[in-house]
């Protein structure tokens, strides 16, 4: 909290789900503003295949339970402290329709999706996996923006976040023909 007060920063934490979900209440109490869970893949079979460590240690259901729990903390506690929950997926590791279903689930519980774009890296298990085609990603990005807007989720609150592989909902505005107030 002292760092926040002195520097005026928002504090975010990316974490695997903890077995004691009440720990997230504590993170909020000490001034954390954003908690993010990178479960990568919404398709259960692909999650088990591509994320064997996450599958063995936590399982997809526990990631989703943690996201749901943390999203429900929005609106509790200090009103002057923003609290946002993110569910992070990696588009291009599963069919676009599965990524869109992930976005729908994440926004349905009041969390904000973060969509990373898969890029194969030399020396990794997925180095030979083809990167997604741009035309396959456009509907995912369009849906990311529209789903957040239709659910009235707070996007664009954290200034100066620029990550080359991540599309934030507000950055996807240009893919949509819909205009929101």
Each predicted region: which residue ranges?
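Core AdoMet radical
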Residues: 1-66, 86, 114
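Generic structural signal for well-ordered alpha-helices
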Residues: 1, 24, 63-71, 99-104, ...
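Auxiliary Fe-S-binding modules of radical SAM enzymes
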Residues: 75-82, 96, 100-181
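Conserved strand-turn element in the central/C-terminal portion of the radical SAM core barrel
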Residues: 10, 14, 18-19, 53, ...
């Amino acid at each position: 909290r002292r760092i926040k007060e002195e520097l005026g920063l928002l504090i975010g934490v990316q974490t695997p789900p903890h077995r004691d979900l009440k720990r997230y209440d504590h993170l909020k109490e000490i001034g954390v503003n954003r908690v993010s869970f990178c479960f990568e893949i919404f398709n259960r079979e692909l999650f088990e295949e591509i994320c064997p460590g996450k599958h063995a240690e936590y399982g997809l259901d526990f990631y989703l339970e943690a996201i749901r729990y943390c999203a429900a903390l929005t609106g509790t506690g200090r009103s002057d402290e923003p609290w946002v929950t993110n569910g992070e997926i990696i588009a291009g590791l599963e069919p676009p329709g599965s990524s869109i279903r992930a976005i729908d689930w994440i926004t349905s519980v009041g969390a904000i999706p973060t969509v990373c774009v898969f890029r194969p890296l030399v020396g990794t298990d997925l180095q030979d996996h083809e990167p997604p085609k741009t035309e396959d990603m456009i509907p995912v990005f369009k849906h990311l923006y529209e789903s957040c807007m239709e659910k009235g989720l707070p996007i664009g609150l954290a200034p100066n976040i620029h990550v080359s592989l991540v599309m934030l909902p507000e950055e996807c505005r240009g893919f949509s023909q819909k205009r929101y107030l």
